[in-house]
Amino acid sequence: MAAENSSFVTQFILAGLTDQPGVQIPLFFLFLGFYVVTVVGNLGLITLIRLNSHLHTPMYFFLYNLSFIDFCYSSVITPKMLMSFVLKKNSISYAGCMTQLFFFLFFVVSESFILSAMAYDRYVAICNPLLYMVTMSPQVCFLLLLGVYGMGFAGAMAHTACMMGVTFCANNLVNHYMCDILPLLECACTSTYVNELVVFVVVGIDIGVPTVTIFISYALILSSIFHIDSTEGRSKAFSTCSSHIIAVSLFFGSGAFMYLKPFSLLAMNQGKVSSLFYTTVVPMLNPLIYSLRNKDVKVALKKILNKNAFS
């Protein structure tokens, strides 16, 4: 067996989002549309930032990486989910399942920390504007990004290593559209106490630390904004931060609802719907939120469109 050292199961069957035949094809086209918008939006924003020298600032450096992360983890999940709508039996090998789990967790944890890095960047820009380029130097930005991906790797390794130590017997039906922690633990035939403990500790850190960082950053930002005399300056500061607050609320709200509930009380079907927000909706909305509410991005896009129109 391919995985006999840790499991009696060599493949899993993904139950998918729903088992109702009448909605499978409509859902396929709906989520295919979501995925196309996600890919076009995030790759478009990445291209726009690379092509426009005015966007080569710390703020857009982090936004560039946010779009990269959104594109990657959406691509880890969505293609397999789409297959569940058109195949009678959507199977995935044990190795494929563990690989999907690792990369999904890597990108999701990285997203939580890139959002906190973006909040810190906005704090420095608004509260210490004169020292902004010194504080957020290329070296500092690189170290922050290294920390973001380092935490992503650590979180993914912790969960995946623990999952590979779990024994799976006859039950290989995963009540989900992807290989995620809690649905996989439902298939285990041995104690999952250690895994559940790791979920609460590691997920608590991966959600708690960024959330605290973001709350502190925005508390200081709001305090600073209220001391701005001009209405125009105050409005500009609020506009700069509002898009980030919306993205943060969607991502952390749905993630906390999925993972920080007692395992025994978790309704998995409810969890599947909740997980759609951070696996499908958030990656699709992020480029729209940051583009439609960002004057610099809209100006840069108009310049490129005008340049192409007259070339």
Swiss-Prot record:
Organism expressing this protein natively: Homo sapiens (Human)
GO biological process, one term: sensory perception of smell
The keyword Cell membrane appears for this protein: yes
Tissue: Expressed in the tongue and testis.
Protein's job: Odorant receptor (Potential). May be involved in taste perception.
GO MF terms, alphabetically ordered: G protein-coupled receptor activity; odorant binding; olfactory receptor activity
Any GO CC annotation of this UniProt entry: membrane
PANTHER family for this protein: OLFACTORY RECEPTOR
Cytoplasmic side: 47-54, 121-139, 218-237, 293-311
Pfam families referenced in this protein's UniProt entry, alphabetically: 7tm_4
UniProt xrefs under InterPro entries: GPCR_Rhodpsn, GPCR_Rhodpsn_7TM, Olfact_rcpt
Protein name as annotated: Olfactory receptor 8B8
Annotated disulfide bonds: C97-C189
Localization annotation: Cell membrane
UniProt membrane topology term: Multi-pass membrane protein
Residue intervals annotated with topology Extracellular: 1-25, 76-99, 161-197, 259-271
Bilayer-crossing regions: 26-46, 55-75, 100-120, 140-160, 198-217, 238-258, 272-292
Sequence similarity: Belongs to the G-protein coupled receptor 1 family.
Domain of life, per lineage: Eukaryota
Keywords: Cell membrane, Disulfide bond, G-protein coupled receptor, Glycoprotein, Membrane, Olfaction, Receptor, Sensory transduction, Transducer, Transmembrane, Transmembrane helix
UniProt-annotated glycosylation sites, renumbered to this chain: N5
Keyword Transferase attributed: no
